[in-house]
Curated annotation (Swiss-Prot):
Residues 125-158 are annotated as: Disordered. Belongs to the NAC-beta family. This is Transcription factor BTF3 homolog 4. Residues 33-98 form the NAC-A/B domain. It holds the Pfam family NAC. Disulfide bonds: none annotated.
Length: 158
């Protein structure tokens, strides 16, 4: 670039005279509502339609976590092959949602679920297997039976 042009551009940026600080660049803070408005305007351009009656949306990741939307707003544009899901999202483990999510799982997820099921009993057995030291400690907490209470109740009945 030409040095003269560069000097002109620098002179335009100065606010005061020679030796003063240059103006600060204005920082524009974006808010979530501004992003949401921009997203909604982009979706309007795609001519999306609202899909009613959807109670929940689950997106299953490869690592076994699930992105769960409860009562989301779902919009679709079939011509653009675009679906927009908006609402409060929660990230959960697949095992937390197991009873209700089984009907939604595909073949890939079912194989990963089988692997989880094979690992789960091993973990439970490892955690619940009582050690000999633990058994002795549990016996100390329970008092020994000294008398026979059945005989006392039979004597009262006679």
């Amino acid at each position: 670039m030409n040095q003269e042009k560069l000097a002109k551009l620098q002179a335009q940026v100065r606010i005061g005279g020679k030796g003063t600080a240059r103006r600060k660049k204005k920082v524009v803070h974006r808010t979530a509502t501004a992003d949401d408005k921009k997203l909604q305007s982009s979706l309007k351009k795609l001519v999306v339609n609202n899909i009613a009656g959807i109670e929940e949306v689950n997106m299953i990741k490869d690592d076994g976590t699930v992105i769960h939307f409860n009562n989301p707003k779902v919009q679709a544009s079939l011509s653009a092959n675009t679906f927009a899901i908006t609402g409060h999202a929660e990230t959960k483990q697949l095992t937390e949602m197991l009873p209700g999510i089984l009907s939604q799982l595909g073949a890939d997820s079912l194989t990963s679920l089988r692997k989880l099921a094979e690992q789960f009993p091993r973990q439970v057995l490892d955690n619940k297997a009582p050690k000999a030291e633990d058994i002795d400690e549990e016996d100390d907490d329970v008092p020994d039976l000294v008398e026979n209470f059945d005989e006392a109740s039979k004597n009262e009945a006679n």
